[in-house]
């Protein structure tokens, strides 16, 4: 799990990078700048 520096509600492939209100990325996603990356 990688800490995000901003609310990452950016969508990729039609799915949210992380749920609204969450402070950390989960589900194999991480936030990088304004991109959601699968790790």
Curated annotation (Swiss-Prot):
**Tissue-specific expression:** Expressed by the venom gland.
Main localization category: secreted
Signal peptide residues are none
Which PROSITE patterns does the record associate with it?
HWTX_2
Domain of life of the organism in this record? Eukaryota
For this chain, the annotated S-S bridges are 4-25, 8-31, 17-36
Q: Name one GO cellular component term.
A: extracellular region
Which Pfam families does the record cross-reference, listed alphabetically? Toxin_20
Q: What's in the keyword line of the UniProt record?
A: Disulfide bond, Neurotoxin, Secreted, Toxin
Could you tell me where this protein is found in the cell? Secreted
UniProt-listed InterPro entries: Hwtx-2-like
GO MF entries: toxin activity
The role this protein plays is: Inhibits voltage-gated calcium channels (Cav) in rat cerebellar granule cells. Has insecticidal activity.
The family assignment reads: Belongs to the neurotoxin 12 (Hwtx-2) family. 06 (TXP1) subfamily.
Q: Kindly give any further remark recorded in the entry.
A: The primary structure of the mature peptide is identical to that of Eurypelma spider toxin 2 from Aphonopelma californicum (AC P61510).
State the name under which the record lists this protein.
Omega-theraphotoxin-Bs1b
Organism (species) = Brachypelma smithi
């Amino acid at each position: 799990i990688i800490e995000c520096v901003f609310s990452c509600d950016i969508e990729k492939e039609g799915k949210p990078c992380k749920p609204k209100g969450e402070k950390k990325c989960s589900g194999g996603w991480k936030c990088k700048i304004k991109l959601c990356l699968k790790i």
